[in-house]
Curated annotation (Swiss-Prot):
Positions with a binding annotation for substrate: T57, D131, E156, K186, D190
InterPro entries: Adenosylhomocyst_ase-like_sf (IPR042172), Adenosylhomocysteinase-like (IPR000043), Ado_hCys_hydrolase_NAD-bd (IPR015878), NAD(P)-bd_dom_sf (IPR036291), S-Ado-L-homoCys_hydrolase_CS (IPR020082)
GO biological process, any: response to hypoxia
Lineage, broadest ranks: Eukaryota, Metazoa, Chordata, Craniata, Vertebrata
Entry function: Catalyzes the hydrolysis of S-adenosyl-L-homocysteine to form adenosine and homocysteine. Binds copper ions.
Species: Rattus norvegicus (Rat)
Co-factor binding details: Binds 1 NAD(+) per subunit.
Effect on the protein upon substituting D131N: Strongly reduces S-adenosyl-L-homocysteine hydrolase activity
Cofactor: NAD(+)
NCBIfam families the record matches: ahcY (TIGR00936), PRK05476.2-3 (NF004005)
Name of the molecule in the record: Adenosylhomocysteinase
Chain sites annotated for binding NAD(+): 157-159, 222-227, 243, 248, 299-301, 346, 353, 426-430
Cellular localisation: Cytoplasm; Melanosome; Nucleus; Endoplasmic reticulum
Length: 432
């Protein structure tokens, strides 16, 4: 049984360093600290056996310890082979929480790690906390006998949410799920402001390239693409956007970006960033037209946006510069610099999003787990959202850290607007 192996990490000796990093992160994660203050005594997650599959970072470690403080048992794996921060994993293992994650897993090891999270000493998992859908898919396809005992899934990211809706449409989804990604305090903060900071961190750590004056091509102009485009423009790049959606394309044009196709943009760019969550965004024909030493990276969840297989099969030479940085020599004499093997550049080459913005996302995760565990009758099989009032509560929990002072409605104003004096302040369809 899996419970015979308490953990598997790169180096348990990194635990002390990891604990120091967690202590600092906690001070930057007021939402999770609020959850501990509110619920540590009542332990609403008592009895929950949560299998988690989400990037094993310092911030995730704070989330894990929050879930445990609220009464849950937790077993954890990372949702990406390169995203684990080994000191964070070691700190969690040292705290006695089963974790199976290390930076640089093989694809086989990655699946093995997920498998280790399914069985607890008192029985199999009964809750899922997922990022990207790999854990959800594994249980539905390989372990369907466990589905009847699972109360719910909370899904972190755009790719995983697409997966849930696809499963629902095909009649495959068997467990209630909460779409955490589309909570306003997740998608409009983590996806936008998080990527705005962590993309540049990843590119700079990997290449130390001067961004000012370069042409940067951003594939996709959703919340992630918007954050990436803002960051690159802020550093002085001329940014080109590619898009399939006319609304997003118009938004990009109105912000002053050139919008064109990848077939055109590939000839101009010095830096390429894919943000789409789709397949086949940068292909062989694009590589062949790129400038010498074009930098290519991805910040979408999976490694399917960039055709890395084409590079490996068609390049004359591949030179590893350092971990997660490879330089390919093409037959035309031009070189392509690929970051993180086409996987998440901000986690493969840097530390991911800052703690503060992840506190937004992870507070939503905690609330979703509490909702699904304590109110199962409210959530039939399907894909659900957190109530607007909880979304606003997540935002409110982070205002004090930024010295924000909210204006309060008067009774007259509330009556005039036709809303409760303490919110919710916007209808569910409001887009922010």
């Amino acid at each position: 049984m899996a419970d015979k192996l308490p953990y598997k990490v790169a180096d348990i000796g990194l635990a002390a360093w990891g604990r120091k990093a967690l202590d600092i992160a906690e001070n930057e994660m007021p939402g999770l600290m609020r959850m501990r203050e509110m619920y540590s005594a009542s332990k609403p997650l008592k009895g929950a056996r949560i299998a988690g599959c989400l990037h094993m970072t310092v911030e995730t470690a704070v989330l894990i310890e929050t879930l445990v403080a609220l009464g849950a048992e937790v077993r954890w794996s990372s949702c990406n082979i390169f995203s684990t921060q080994d000191h964070a994993a070691a700190a969690i293992a040292k705290a006695g929480i089963p974790v199976f994650a290390w930076k640089g897993e093989t694809d086989e090891e990655y699946l093995w790690c997920i498998e280790q999270t399914l069985h607890f000493k008192d029985g199999p998992l009964n809750m899922i906390l997922d990022d990207g859908g790999d854990l959800t898919n594994l249980i539905h396809t390989k372990h369907p006998q466990l589905l009847s005992g699972i109360r719910g899934i909370s899904e972190e990211t755009t790719t995983g949410v697409h997966n849930l809706y696809k499963m629902m449409a095909n009649g495959i989804l068997k467990v209630p799920a909460i779409n955490v990604n589309d909570s306003v305090t997740k998608s409009k903060f983590d996806n936008l402001y998080g990527c705005r900071e962590s993309l540049i961190d990843g590119i700079k750590r990997a290449t130390d390239v001067m961004i000012a004056g370069k042409v940067a091509v951003v594939a996709g102009y959703g919340d992630v693409g918007k954050g990436c485009a803002q960051a690159l423009r802020g550093f002085g790049a001329r940014v080109i956007i590619t898009e399939i959606d006319p609304i997003n394309a118009l938004q990009a044009a109105m912000e002053g970006y050139e919008v064109t196709t990848m077939d055109e943009a590939c000839k101009e760019g010095n830096i390429f960033v894919t943000t789409t969550g789709c397949v086949d965004i940068i292909l062989g024909r694009h590589f062949e037209q790129m400038k010498d030493d074009a930098i290519v990276c991805n910040i979408g969840h999976f490694d399917v946006e960039i055709d890395v297989k084409w590079l490996n099969e068609n390049a004359v030479e591949k030179v590893n510069i350092k971990p997660q940085v490879d330089r390919y020599l093409l037959k035309n004499g031009h070189r392509i610099i690929l970051l993180a093997e086409g996987r998440l550049v901000n986690l493969g080459c840097a530390m991911g999003h800052p703690s503060f913005v992840m506190s937004n996302s992870f507070t939503n995760q905690v609330m979703a787990q509490i909702e699904l565990w304590t109110h199962p009758d409210k959530y039939p099989v399907g894909v659900h959202f957190l109530p607007k009032k909880l979304d606003e509560a997540v935002a409110e929990a982070h205002l004090g850290k930024l010295n924000v002072k909210l204006t309060k409605l008067t009774e007259k104003q509330a009556q005039y607007l036709g809303m409760p004096i303490n919110g919710p302040f916007k209808p569910d369809h409001y887009r922010y």
